[in-house]
């Protein structure tokens, strides 16, 4: 009020005319500050102390006349020009007018002597008259308005809007009226610059937080202060520029719920399942067995990782059984007994150096290896003979006229008759090799051409009614050989450990 008196009183104007040094430089700008026609233009010294220009949105419908009267009555309006003009006051005031001196002293006493530090904070800008509503919360304007307009607003439906809560509320809720002569064109330009920038969602957008914020924002609609009359065009401008942040209504997201089946559908499904189970239970065992075998074969094939090949039946069934026995990891007792003789014969030949075999004369490999359990044509075992040389192996049993060991098969496996052991009435110990005359080898002579000794039989020589299981040749075509390692080497036949690898290999 005191500052108003100094500007309105007649003595002050007369002293100003007489003593121009007491007048404030550029005093013409002071009354122009209250007119809404043109913005204030201060000197360089005043621009240094002038607070930062605040780009806020003003509305043309405001009554500027009432605003001028309010500014004249508020003492805070006159404090700002007094602060800026005290730097040019003279050190000793003139004594022409006592009233002006007293008013100036009072005004100077109110001015703080500290240095002016403007940090562009909203608290110092708000010292000027701001028409605020009674419900306005000044704590929202703690952040500087310059920061709100300088940084780009990157808004999208997936953007965390909580970061821009203060800035958006400041721009949209309240029109900041710093001075009645605010430049409206500059404010609109700054708002358009902010909103025309590309809206790009940050990579780390928090969707749940933005949804909650939007829902809260629509529950409490923004209302302008009662003292301000905001036109509808401003809202249309904002809604056109930033469509992402404006949601018409806070509606919950639709949840895609699968319709539950009706009771009739459930009953029909349960009935179908029961019928399927009954059909499976009443199905034929052949179908289930075939499916099980196919599944087992497929599983075994995947496990081994090899391709299956079609099995071609052999002409002779005994060969199939022999092949199965050869490829088994653990032989049964019968097959193990058969190959155990071969194994024992090979080990004894390596130890003694005498290789005894039964083969055709022109073969390089033996059809059978002779061991201690092998039987001679005379009916005695090899261990019952005495090995003198390769040409003399007489039988040591009394009253036996056998002078040379002659091998004869004593087991049905050696002649390829594997099926005989499957008969219930078959006795392996009673089995003997027979001649075509239907008599056994024991009923033939042990020497010479082995004529038949049965009364009334006119068989002059033994002719086997079986074939060799190794070469499919008759018994009389084979011979028994007693050889040493040197003989084997000269005949280019396997010896040593090679005998175990090359058994039953015909010429």
Curated annotation (Swiss-Prot):
Residues carrying Phosphoserine: 270
Region described as Disordered: 1-100, 154-310, 486-507
Amino acid composition bias (Polar residues), ranges on this chain: 88-100, 182-193
Extent of Acidic residues compositional bias: 167-177, 208-222, 270-281
Coiled coil regions, renumbered to chain: none
One Pfam family cited in the UniProt record for this chain: FAM221
Keyword field: Phosphoprotein
Disulfide bond residue pairs: none
PANTHER family reported in the protein's UniProt record: PROTEIN FAM221A-RELATED, PROTEIN FAM221B
Similarity annotation: Belongs to the FAM221 family.
Name of the protein in question: Protein FAM221B
Organism: Rattus norvegicus (Rat)
């Amino acid at each position: 009020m005191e500052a108003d008196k100094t500007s309105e009183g007649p003595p002050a104007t007369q002293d100003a005319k007489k003593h121009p040094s007491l007048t404030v430089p550029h005093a013409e700008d002071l009354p122009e500050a209250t007119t809404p026609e043109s913005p204030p233009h201060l000197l360089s010294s005043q621009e240094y102390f002038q607070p930062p220009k605040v780009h806020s949105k003003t509305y043309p419908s405001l009554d500027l006349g009432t605003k001028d009267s309010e500014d004249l009555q508020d003492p805070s309006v006159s404090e700002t020009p007094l602060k800026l003009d005290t730097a040019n006051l003279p050190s000793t005031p003139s004594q022409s007018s006592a009233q002006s001196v007293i008013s100036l002293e009072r005004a100077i006493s109110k001015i703080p002597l500290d240095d002016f530090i403007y940090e562009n904070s909203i608290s110092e800008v708000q010292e000027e008259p701001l028409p605020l509503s009674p419900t306005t919360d000044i704590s929202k304007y703690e952040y500087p308005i310059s920061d709100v307009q300088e940084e780009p607003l990157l808004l999208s439906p997936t953007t965390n809007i909580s970061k821009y809560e203060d800035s958006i509320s400041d721009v949209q809720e309240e029109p900041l009226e710093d001075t009645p002569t605010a430049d409206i064109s500059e404010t609109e330009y700054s708002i358009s610059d902010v909103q025309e920038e590309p809206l790009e969602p940050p990579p780390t957008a928090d969707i749940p937080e933005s949804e909650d914020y939007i829902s809260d924002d629509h529950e409490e609609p923004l209302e302008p202060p009662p003292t301000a009359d905001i036109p509808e065009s401003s809202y249309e401008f904002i809604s056109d520029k930033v469509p992402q942040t404006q949601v018409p209504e806070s509606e919950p997201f639709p949840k895609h719920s699968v319709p539950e089946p009706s009771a009739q559908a459930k009953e029909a499904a349960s009935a179908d399942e029961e019928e399927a189970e009954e059909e499976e239970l009443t199905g034929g065992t052949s179908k289930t067995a075939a499916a099980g075998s196919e599944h087992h074969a497929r599983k075994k094939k995947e496990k081994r990782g090899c391709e299956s090949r079609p099995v071609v039946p052999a002409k002779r069934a005994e060969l199939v059984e022999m092949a199965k026995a050869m490829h088994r990891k653990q032989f049964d007792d019968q097959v193990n007994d058969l190959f155990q003789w071969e194994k024992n014969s090979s080990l004894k030949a390596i130890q003694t150096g005498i290789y005894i075999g039964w083969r055709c004369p022109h073969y390089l490999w033996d059809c059978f290896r002779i061991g201690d359990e092998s039987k001679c044509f005379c009916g005695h075992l090899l261990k019952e003979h005495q090995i003198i040389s390769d040409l003399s192996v007489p039988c040591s049993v009394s009253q036996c006229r056998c002078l040379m060991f002659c091998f004869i098969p004593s087991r049905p496996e050696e002649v390829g008759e594997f099926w005989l052991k499957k008969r219930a009435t078959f006795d392996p110990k009673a089995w003997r090799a027979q001649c075509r005359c239907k008599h056994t080898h024991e009923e033939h002579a042990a020497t010479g051409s082995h004529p038949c000794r049965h009364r009334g039989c006119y068989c002059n020589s033994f002719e086997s009614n079986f074939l060799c299981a190794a070469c499919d040749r008759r018994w009389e075509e084979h011979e028994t050989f007693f050889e040493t390692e040197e003989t084997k080497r000269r005949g280019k036949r396997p010896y040593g450990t090679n005998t175990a690898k090359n058994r039953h290999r015909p010429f």
